[in-house]
């Protein structure tokens, strides 16, 4: 799927939270976007603007544009995201539905 780029991990950080980490070396914060569309988390990376102006004698570090999609389960929301040391971390939180107890009054027959 999508040639495996960029590589990513999904880890559970608590009973109700998860973290998706993508290896996005070479991409700045302005080159990345995160959206949620119809329960799909979509991470996109655009090639940095100065890529076209550079003449590479050897090109071993990939910085091509990408799109990665993750299906979010019901009740899972994006809690935040940050980028550091070439890794993009997307934190997810699963909301635990509150248990609502309703007492039904029993009336006498009509």
Which sequence ranges carry the predicted segments?
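Alpha-crystallin/small heat shock protein
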Residues: 1-110
């Amino acid at each position: 799927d999508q040639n495996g780029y960029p590589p990513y991990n999904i880890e559970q950080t608590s009973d109700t939270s998860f973290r998706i980490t993508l290896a996005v070396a070479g991409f700045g914060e302005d080159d990345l976007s995160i959206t949620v569309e119809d329960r799909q988390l979509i991470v996109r990376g655009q090639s940095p603007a100065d890529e076209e102006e550079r003449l590479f004698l050897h090109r071993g570090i990939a910085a091509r544009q990408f799109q990665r999609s993750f299906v979010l389960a019901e009740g899972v929301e994006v809690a935040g995201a940050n980028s550091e040391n070439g890794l993009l971390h997307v934190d997810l939180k699963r909301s635990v539905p509150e248990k609502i107890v309703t007492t039904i009054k029993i009336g006498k027959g009509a």
